[in-house]
């Protein structure tokens, strides 16, 4: 099984030294991610493409899925590589591989060639195309918009028959740009803005300001872990949780109502700047869009930025909400965001849309900055992979089981895409599918006389959701111990 990885076009136009560095980084990223699923995979870099090989045919579906989510890959080709002797041998091998798929179809043959041969690419197209047309009575040659395009790449004495083309997400490989710190709230905007910087080649760390208690933090951790695991699992990143409840309390008590929203955002970027400085991160990323809410006018955004010592970047600044939601759906964060309340909006009833600097600074003189300093000093710093370990400690009242009773139902909480690609079954036991992001709204509708054992491939979401359900009064929930079984 072989895949040929084609690079993002902007990589191709870089200088030779930059291009080599980018390709080297992308090769390492691909290897780091694929080794989690197939420890026998081989990744080899070439000048203008990267080659991925595996002997484990059963891993085909997961490798295709994962390659389609690695930044830096424009598209990749699934190929069947074989040696050949002459043009007739190329024709015979092509007929054996694709003949059945051309029945009752129109087709054309396209060839790319490297190396020294006695024939040209056009010669091969004509010879193979003519041969297929004669050998398959119901097939017909059509050079424009055919039903099937037979693609063959020839390099020296080997031919590659292209079986399928799969699209990547493009962008730059992670690690080719500097790190950023994303202020993630769990809503549509912050998830999408985080993804946009991942796709642009930055390693994205996450900073969460907790305004809503344990349930809010669990939801945000789910989103951050989902984005990291799907799109940037090649790199270690940090998840920073800062309890902002006392900061909000100080604002509610001492700041004029109309200025609360801007002051809160200024406190957030001050705190985030301290975190960024600690880890040598150059920029803060937010999901703000111009005019979307009262604090997001140009006047207010400028005042917010003045409180930051780090560069503040807003990739969604000109995006419509509809476009942002569509992108959230594309990357798989929309359902998580739908269940996440917006806490910032509840603290100011009559927010100003054009804050005055002198007035904001005067209001902040009433604020006890020791409260902000304490919040930053007591921040929780996690390697995002430790979310599972931390949850293991938190979910002390949730049983982990490997042997099931007759009253136990396995609840597969993976996303629909993961469920469809790798269905989970266990002989003798009922398995239901309910995506993790629907548990909060639909778990109560299940038969509560049953015990539900949560299943996901790595166990992280199962443990997070078990904690959430326990906190909401559901005692009939446990975690499946063999969460890494496919």
Swiss-Prot record:
Catalytic activity: [ThiI sulfur-carrier protein]-S-sulfanyl-L-cysteine + a uridine in tRNA + 2 reduced [2Fe-2S]-[ferredoxin] + ATP + H(+) = [ThiI sulfur-carrier protein]-L-cysteine + a 4-thiouridine in tRNA + 2 oxidized [2Fe-2S]-[ferredoxin] + AMP + diphosphate; [ThiS sulfur-carrier protein]-C-terminal Gly-Gly-AMP + S-sulfanyl-L-cysteinyl-[cysteine desulfurase] + AH2 = [ThiS sulfur-carrier protein]-C-terminal-Gly-aminoethanethioate + L-cysteinyl-[cysteine desulfurase] + A + AMP + 2 H(+)
InterPro entries per the UniProt record, alphabetical: Rhodanese-like_dom, Rhodanese-like_dom_sf, Rossmann-like_a/b/a_fold, ThiI_AANH, ThiI_fer, ThiI_N, THII_Thiazole_biosynth_dom, THUMP_dom
Broad EC category: transferase
Record-annotated Rhodanese domain positions: 404-481
A Pfam family that the UniProt record links to this protein: ThiI
Any GO molecular function: ATP binding
EC numbers on record: 2.8.1.4
UniProt xrefs under PROSITE patterns: RHODANESE_3 (PS50206), THUMP (PS51165)
Amino acids binding ATP: 183-184, 265, 287, 296
Disulfides per UniProt: 344-456
Localization: Cytoplasm
HAMAP family with a match to the protein in the record: ThiI (MF_00021)
PANTHER family cross-referenced by the UniProt entry: TRNA SULFURTRANSFERASE
Described purpose of this protein according to its UniProt entry: Catalyzes the ATP-dependent transfer of a sulfur to tRNA to produce 4-thiouridine in position 8 of tRNAs, which functions as a near-UV photosensor. Also catalyzes the transfer of sulfur to the sulfur carrier protein ThiS, forming ThiS-thiocarboxylate. This is a step in the synthesis of thiazole, in the thiamine biosynthesis pathway. The sulfur is donated as persulfide by IscS.
Protein name stated in the entry: tRNA sulfurtransferase
Organism: Mannheimia succiniciproducens (strain KCTC 0769BP / MBEL55E)
Underlying gene: thiI
